[in-house]
């Protein structure tokens, strides 16, 4: 079978220019998803092209991905990233992946032992918020999570990411091996502390001495990741096959823009990521806050309200002047004033984001971005609203964004079509939707403490703002409500 590993590819395809036989699995990565392929793996590949080295990646998937992993093996662990710009596309074959393991194809035991190999220096993760098994209300490990319960009863046969990390570190400690750095690359706030809380929470329940060793010897750098990477579709894979002249089932498309800011706290070394344009810093928090509110907050605003209004893609929203102006106004008038970052031109940042959102080549679906809103709403909108409430400043578009999420998860768009709502809390949400009418819906959903906390549902100004925005959506529909908010 001809694959990208054996085919003669077109001359415009960038191909690894380093000796892949020198790679070792020095990075073990949880979650061979679209974002990782187009971001961390690509940037590590760029380092290898620039300066060489042996920083290979071993990809790990636990509960799915066996088909993808089989396909990756068939093409010598190579895959393609197609960077799609308004002025043309650039195909890049990534060679940084050295091997892959899957619980179904291999075994959980083999996966855990991989973490214990002496050369492993970094364990990185893109497992989404759900994968860390954190209780959103406390920020700590959720002891009631089924996988955590299983792992505490079966510590040497763990099923969760925290359980596997702790078991691997326990074995390294017992064998006298040095620890590794745990690097969350997920687009969640304070991701370094999230994974640290998960790992230490699990370790403390197993052994206080083990927890102390991990706290003293393992580092958990924070990161800020930024690149728009839509999920692969049959259409995107067909386009890439046309570009390459051969199928690549592991390929992914993305925008040209890429940014990665990483706290430079590594206990066992790291690739020279700075040679690939990565920003190494002492504190990632201001960067992360800017990205979550400016980019992700406006992305979610467009996803929920744009979907309700009938826009299938973010670029469709950008062709609608009402949504385009609203996204920019949301960034500059309501999100930017809540940020603590200094030395960054936020006006230029907003203009850049609008241009990125407008890229018609990406076909980034509003429905995809609208997923998992219960996990995204707090950091993308609610934290900024808290700043406005403390200052007694205005936040009409943020209110509309929150109400837009409520309309979206209620399950019907402005044309009366049923919405396929995907969310970790979908059962709780559906119950509250079913038990409330339109007049009660806001209060019913505000009762979800894991989203809104204990403070916001008891803040009269907040509740009034969301009720008013909900009423605008119920009366006028999403597009007209957004237009009215622009002029309020």
Please place each PLM-identified region on the residue numbering.
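Substrate/ligand-engaging "lid" and interaction regions
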Residues: 1-488
